[in-house]
Amino acid sequence: MLNIWCWNDEFQSRFNDYYPEVKEIAADKSTTTLKDGTTVKWTINANENNNYQNKLDEALLKQDSAAADDKIDIFLVEADYALKYVDSDYTLDVKNDVGLTDDDLKDQYQYTKDIVSVDGVQKGTSWQATPGLFAYRRSIAKDVLGTDDPAEVQSALSDWDKFNTVAEEAAAKGYKMLSGYDDAFRVFSNNVSEPWVDGTTVKVDPNIMKWVDQTKEYTDKGYNNKSSLWDSQWAADQGPTGKVFGFFYSTWGINFT
């Protein structure tokens, strides 16, 4: 028995579709049987309200006492909270403990390695990489900038000073530059110069304060719609009647627009 925990069926579906050792998939997709007789059991708990992490944490705390067929063998994590598990005894060195080789890992992106490494030890690996991007509404870009051409829009938004200038121009025409408070957060937080925690000291990187300053300015001047990531207003702003210039996404986010 191989137990794999996920928060949706993305990894499960790719495993079932492309792993050459798959022999049979249960009608309800709860298990996958491999050609060597191994049964892969899938446990899927949705992300909402921290549900996935809560249930995963509870199960991991019971690992030592769990029956062999109930122990978690593989679990998926997101970059936002990967280090919580990487920096724990619940994860293994993928080379020395699991047996992956340098050749197995040679094509990984460095940033996907870094997020699952601690003290030089890699304790996970990624099956996907989703770079960040800024998706904009072409009709609004054309109204504000006079063009919807991606190269020209990119040039107009190529640094924060330019981005802020366009936000002012968009507001003058009745648009919001961003939907909410945390839309730009990852652009700043993913470019910090040092970790949040140093020993027992919490450090707030200057780049985080730049995000705070920008968010306050956008809120005070009406450049955002005062939404929060994933809430109903944020979702509506992406709809056909939305008045928001654009959204910071990863590549998978495009599918939800």
Protein language model features and the residues they cover:
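A local structural motif
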Residues: 27-51, 67, 147-153, 200, ...
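Beta->alpha turn/N-cap motifs
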Residues: 7-8, 77-81, 130, 181-184, ...
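Helix-loop-helix "hinge/cap" segment bordering the ligand-binding cleft or interdomain interface
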Residues: 95-106, 113-184, 196-229
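Short, solvent-exposed loop/turn and secondary-structure capping segments
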Residues: 14-17, 85-90, 146, 190
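Conserved N-terminal structural module of periplasmic/extracytoplasmic solute-binding proteins
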Residues: 1-83, 102
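Loop/turn elements at helix/coil->beta-strand transitions in domains of secreted/extracellular proteins
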Residues: 2, 36-40, 68-73, 121-122, ...
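Extracytoplasmic/periplasmic substrate-binding proteins
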Residues: 12, 16, 20-21, 213-257
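Pocket-flanking alpha-helical
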Residues: 49-92, 105-124, 161-173, 236-238, ...
